[in-house]
Every structure is written in C-alpha cells, then in structure tokens.
C-alpha cells in the first residue's frame, strides 16, 4: 500500500540528492506501507516522486538523533524543535528514491486538498 505524504521542498531536494536518507515523523501509519508518494508542499505543490521504504525505526527523540543525525538532512535545532513535545520519534529509512519525469498534480490522484501529514492512496504510475 502507498501513502501520499506532504514533505517540505527543502527536504525533498535533500532526499533526491541523497543527503537525507531518513524521513522523520511524529506519528506513524496504521496500515502496512511500502511506498511513500512524495508531495512537495508549498510553494511547489506538486507530486514529484516516490520513496521505497526499507524499514522504520522508533525511539525516544534524543537517542534517535544521536544515532542518525548525519543522515537526517536537518539541523539539531530544527530536529529538537520538531520533536519538542514528543516522547517517540519515527525515522523512515529510505531504500530507494524514484523521481518522476513529469511532476503530477493532486487532482491526478483524485485528491483536492494536500494532506496535513499523509493520506492512503491506491495508485500506480
């Protein structure tokens, strides 16, 4: 199963460049997911590619930072600000990234509004 996930453009760039090999989240999917369809949020507002998931790591924020900080594509300040009220941090390990040749619109998925975090989808390119 796939999810459409909103990711800030600066992090999308780092994912495609290979400098960000984990996607961070505060909450995790309730269903088993193998692929994340990347929605590059404002100002791009385009569906730009896919992430094939390797595995998901969960931990308290501090030890997760200590073990993965060089692969997160985020500053220490940004990281701890993001997780400031969280007891658990989730790191989605990226196995493979697929960049679409042609960017897509949300309407191509039958979606009118971008998800705040993620949305389950049934779709194949």
Language model region names:
Residues 1-2, 6-32, 45-48, 56-125:
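Contiguous surface segments at macromolecular interaction interfaces
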Residues 34-41:
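Short conserved beta-strand and strand-loop elements enriched in small hydrophobics
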């Amino acid at each position: 199963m796939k999810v459409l996930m909103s990711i800030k453009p600066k992090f999308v760039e780092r994912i495609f460049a290979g400098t960000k090999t984990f996607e961070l989240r505060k909450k995790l999917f309730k269903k088993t997911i193998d692929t994340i369809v990347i929605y590059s949020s404002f100002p791009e507002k385009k569906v730009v590619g896919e992430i094939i998931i390797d595995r998901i790591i969960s931990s308290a924020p501090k030890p997760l930072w200590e073990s993965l900080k060089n692969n997160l594509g985020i500053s220490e300040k940004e990281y701890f600000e993001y997780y400031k009220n969280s007891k658990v941090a989730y790191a989605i390990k990226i196995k493979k990234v697929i960049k679409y040749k042609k960017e897509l619109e949300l309407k191509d998925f039958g979606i009118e509004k971008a998800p705040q975090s993620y949305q389950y989808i049934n779709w194949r390119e």
